[in-house]
Amino acid sequence: MRPEGLEPPAYWFEASRSIQLSYGRIASSYHPNEYRFTMAVETEIKLRLPLGAERARALLEQHGFHATGPRQLETDQTFDLPTGELRQSGRLLRLRSAGDRWIVTYKGPAAAGDRHKSREEIETGVSDGAAFAQILERLGYQPSFAYEKFRTTFKSPGEDGIATLDETPIGDFMELEGPGYWIDRTAQQLGFGPADYITSSYATLYEEHRRVHETVPRDMKFQSP
């Protein structure tokens, strides 16, 4: 029971009303000054796009998908304890800059034994990303890996998931996020099968890339010409 006269802050009620247990990200709807957050079970796969993002965009549009917003640069910074505890346990703590928005994300360990990657995801917007990063560092977390991508998000009316095109320094990828049945059906419609599914993170994919290209930088960022 709450002690008499002790009321939670007003934004707590707004946050409580905004909890959504659903598939799919709604981060694109965040405004940095809103105390809004989501809790969800994220289910997704990646697909490598050897023919490039433009060919994939045309393919999505042929199947009724439309971009929900402009192509946008996202800069992600993950944080971990000095021991690497989060990475070792399959968890992730990430601060994302996307346009004028800052988004903080926690992801839990992925469920084992599935061809899709399913994990708990909690997201919220913050108004000052630099200040939030300092708070994390004061709590003992340190920057662990940074990566960039140009992302375009697509949705088909009435469908249960979203598709994103990611143009990264190591190639172009498509992410399909939604219920497992929707992922499998959509991947098949686009010409992909389970053998094409990638459940690795961009951090893992970049580690594999660095083992072949030893001179590339530590972080996955676009290099100036």
Where are these regions (language model features)?
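Short, positively charged low-complexity motifs
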Residues: 5, 18-21
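Internal alpha/beta scaffold segment
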Residues: 183-190
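N-terminal, intrinsically disordered charge-dense segments
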Residues: 27-36
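N-terminal strand-loop-strand beta-hairpin
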Residues: 39-160, 196-225
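A contiguous pocket-lining binding segment that forms or flanks enzyme active sites
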Residues: 163-170
